[in-house]
């Protein structure tokens, strides 16, 4: 007898032999079911249960169900491509955020017409409602099969699997693909999809390997969800930070410094405003600021463990045959050196050490994307050295600070991913228990909802990832807090405890923005360049109608600059309509327009960004209102 526990209903049923999901689920449940979990592992509904188990039904409404449908769509796309272009070889086709892709080896360059034809063929395959059939094969069986049909990339994948290990393939109609699964019952479960674009990709991500063509697609539960997503993409394209940056003259990137930013006056002003804001928050919350070297000997990276784990992403300089230097990819080992420069007591803890640290990582050129993915960046980095019993209270304080910063920057929807102990880790279970409990209690105390990310903690401790939602519903993972038991020990950090003996501190790695570059990119897209006045690089533009107003405009400008207002005064001979268009396209939030009447009456005409309405204010009232708006933060 096999005993099956239905977790949702908390019911137990017994069956006389092996059963599948189709055998044990009621017809109503089967209509909604995509797959099921057996003792935590995802199974196809057709896969047999062989022993006592706990099951959980996965429906399309679940995230796991949607991910399976996207996986189905990837296989359907591969089948469609093979039917339309038989000489194409298939490689890999995983799911990604919001969709899927599949890489193809072909001499053909896929066009937009090809994508339309592939979509049409996919709809035919979906309408045919082919069953997804799972089969377990030996390694030899798979190599022989894929060799016979000329799929050399599949042979390459199978050849990398240990000889004694079985693998799974899935069949749909006449199409067979190597796959771990699971899949839904049939191709007809895919209800709404669209192919998005074609891009290049290297086989196994190796730039020395063959170039493939990657077709991206998206799939959703229904057409309404698909249309909502496509509209969001349209809006995201309008908000692309690279386009807006050009209009606002914020920054540029060029081939001579790939992955690094040339900040222009307006962009660097925005950068400095954000840095000053964060610095003030840190100082008000008990942090002190340090500055550490950019170029550090490999000896320190070897001691910290980063040389083995991170070397491929470092920029390395050979000073001599025996001495190598690395441009730092992170700040933490250098902060431990500052901690170690004094004898520390338990009375000194916690120590909150912050740095706007410039770091470099050798990211592949294909992964670089405007401000969102760069090689040279600055982190709002800080490390808290504390006793184990202080982890909870320090985490609560950090969560409160993070919520305050995000809210003031315009992000009020925050979620948290909690990553607990991985299988391979340092430290004993008792220490991990205490650290995980401290983080969870802190997140709850801070009033934040969290999602468990099982086994995804670092080898040195559990971590929290903070995700904010922007104005068009996209999620961005920015803030982090990681508990580290290992680095202080590796680098010899200690404090003198109440017992007079040496103890290693716990190190909390934490950031709110992540990197300034990426966060500024997020801000640009969130606000579509229309920043709140306190954050805008130029807060006010004074525009004159004729040169008769120049003296009055200059006088106002000088007074406001002394009060810290970031201001531009346009005294050019251009028409006022042109000046308004020019400064509006630069996203200046407030315009003051000055003509003969304003000079005579000591007034200004105020026009806000996005409005055609102009209102006349006395200079005194306009100034008071402007300063009030600026000083909201």
UniProtKB/Swiss-Prot annotation:
Manner of cofactor binding, per the entry note: Binds 1 zinc ion per subunit.
Region spans: Catalytic: 240-532
Kindly list the places in or outside the cell where this protein is found, as annotated in its UniProt entry.
Cytoplasm
- The domain of life is Bacteria
**Cross-referenced PROSITE patterns:** AA_TRNA_LIGASE_II (PS50862), TGS (PS51880)
- Write out the entry's keywords from A to Z: Aminoacyl-tRNA synthetase, ATP-binding, Cytoplasm, Ligase, Metal-binding, Nucleotide-binding, Protein biosynthesis, RNA-binding, tRNA-binding, Zinc
Reaction(s) catalysed by this chain's protein: tRNA(Thr) + L-threonine + ATP = L-threonyl-tRNA(Thr) + AMP + diphosphate + H(+)
> Domain named TGS: which ranges?
1-59
* UniProt keyword Zinc present: yes
UniProt-listed Enzyme Commission number(s): 6.1.1.3
Where along the chain is Zn(2+) bound?
332, 383, 509
Instruction: Supply one GO molecular-function term.
Output: tRNA binding
Would you tell me the Gene Ontology cellular component terms? cytoplasm
Matches recorded under SUPFAM superfamilies: Class II aaRS ABD-related (SSF52954), Class II aaRS and biotin synthetases (SSF55681), TGS-like (SSF81271), ThrRS/AlaRS common domain (SSF55186)
Needed co-factor(s): Zn(2+)
Q: What class of enzyme is it?
A: ligase
Keyword tRNA processing present in the record's keywords: the answer is: no
Q: Which GO terms describe its biological process?
A: threonyl-tRNA aminoacylation
Q: What does this protein do?
A: Catalyzes the attachment of threonine to tRNA(Thr) in a two-step reaction: L-threonine is first activated by ATP to form Thr-AMP and then transferred to the acceptor end of tRNA(Thr). Also edits incorrectly charged L-seryl-tRNA(Thr).
Q: Which PANTHER family match?
A: THREONINE--TRNA LIGASE, CHLOROPLASTIC_MITOCHONDRIAL 2 (PTHR11451:SF44), THREONINE-TRNA LIGASE (PTHR11451)
* Known partners and oligomeric status: Homodimer.
Q: Which family would the database say this protein is a member of?
A: Belongs to the class-II aminoacyl-tRNA synthetase family.
| Name recorded for this polypeptide | Threonine--tRNA ligase
Per the record, the gene is thrS
């Amino acid at each position: 007898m096999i005993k099956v526990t239905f977790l949702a209903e908390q019911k137990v049923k017994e069956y006389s032999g092996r059963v599948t999901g189709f055998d044990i689920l009621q017809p109503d449940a089967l209509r909604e079911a995509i797959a099921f979990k057996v003792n935590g592992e995802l199974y196809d509904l057709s896969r047999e249960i062989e022993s006592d188990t706990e099951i959980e039904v996965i429906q399309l409404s679940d995230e796991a169900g949607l991910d399976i449908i996207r996986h189905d769509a990837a296989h359907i796309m591969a089948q469609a491509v093979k039917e339309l272009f038989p000489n194409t070889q298939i490689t890999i086709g995983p799911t990604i955020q919001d969709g899927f892709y599949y890489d193809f080896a072909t001499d053909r360059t896929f066009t937009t017409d090809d994508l339309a034809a592939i979509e049409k063929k996919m709809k035919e395959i979906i309408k045919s409602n082919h069953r997804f059939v799972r089969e377990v094969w030996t390694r030899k069986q798979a190599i022989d099969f894929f060799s016979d049909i000329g799929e050399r990339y599949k042979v390459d994948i199978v050849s990398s699997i240990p000889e004694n290990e079985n693998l799974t393939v899935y069949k749909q109609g006449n199409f067979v693909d190597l796959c771990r699964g699971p899949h839904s019952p049939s191709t007809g479960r895919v209800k709404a999809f669209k192919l998005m674009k074609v891009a290049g990709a290297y086989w196994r991500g190796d730039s020395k390997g063959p170039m493939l063509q990657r077709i991206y697609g998206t799939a959703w539960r229904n057409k309404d969800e698909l249309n909502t997503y496509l509209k969001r993409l349209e809006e995201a394209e309008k908000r692309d930070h690279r386009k807006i940056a050009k209009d606002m003259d914020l920054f540029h990137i060029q081939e001579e410094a790939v992955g690094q930013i040339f900040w222009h006056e307006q962009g660097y002003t925005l950068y400095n405003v954000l840095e000053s804001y964060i610095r003030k928050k840190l100082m008000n919350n008990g942090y002190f600021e340090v500055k550490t070297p950019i170029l550090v000997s490999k000896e320190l990276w070897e001691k910290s463990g980063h040389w083995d784990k991170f070397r491929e992403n470092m920029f390395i300089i050979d000073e001599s045959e025996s001495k190598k230097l690395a441009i730092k990819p992170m700040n933490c080992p250098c902060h431990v050196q500052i901690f170690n420069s004094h004898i520390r007591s338990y009375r000194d803890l916690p120590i909150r050490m912050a740095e706007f640290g410039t770091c470099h990582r050798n990211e592949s050129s294909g992964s670089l994307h405007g401000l969102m993915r760069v090689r040279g960046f600055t982190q709002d980095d800080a490390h808290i050295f504390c006793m184990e019993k202080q982890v909870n209270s320090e985490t609560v304080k950090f969560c409160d600070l993070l919520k305050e910063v995000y809210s003031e920057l315009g992000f009020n929807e925050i979620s948290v991913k909690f990553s607990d102990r991985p299988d391979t880790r340092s430290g004993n279970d008792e220490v991990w228990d205490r650290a995980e409990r401290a983080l969870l209690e802190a997140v709850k105390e801070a009033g934040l909802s969290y999602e468990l990310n099982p086994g995804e903690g670092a080898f040195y401790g559990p971590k929290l990832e903070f995700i904010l939602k922007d104005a068009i519903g996209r999620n961005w993972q920015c803030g982090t807090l990681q508990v580290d038991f290992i680095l202080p020990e590796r680098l010899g950090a200690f404090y003198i405890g109440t017992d007079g003996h040496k103890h290693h501190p716990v190190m909390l790695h934490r950031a709110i923005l992540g990197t300034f570059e990426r966060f500024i990119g997020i801000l640009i897209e969130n606000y579509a360049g229309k920043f709140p006045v306190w954050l805008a690089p130029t807060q006010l533009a004074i525009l004159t109608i004729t040169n008769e107003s120049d003296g009055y405009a200059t006088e106002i400008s000088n007074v406001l600059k002394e009060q810290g207002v970031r201001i531009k005064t346009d005294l050019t001979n251009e028409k006022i309509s042109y000046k308004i268009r020019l400064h509006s396209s630069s996203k200046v939030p407030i315009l003051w327009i000055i003509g003969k009447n304003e000079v005579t009456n000591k007034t200004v005409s105020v026009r806000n960004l996005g409005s055609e309405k102009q209102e006349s204010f006395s200079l005194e009232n306009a100034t008071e209102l402007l300063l009030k708006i600026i000083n909201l933060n």
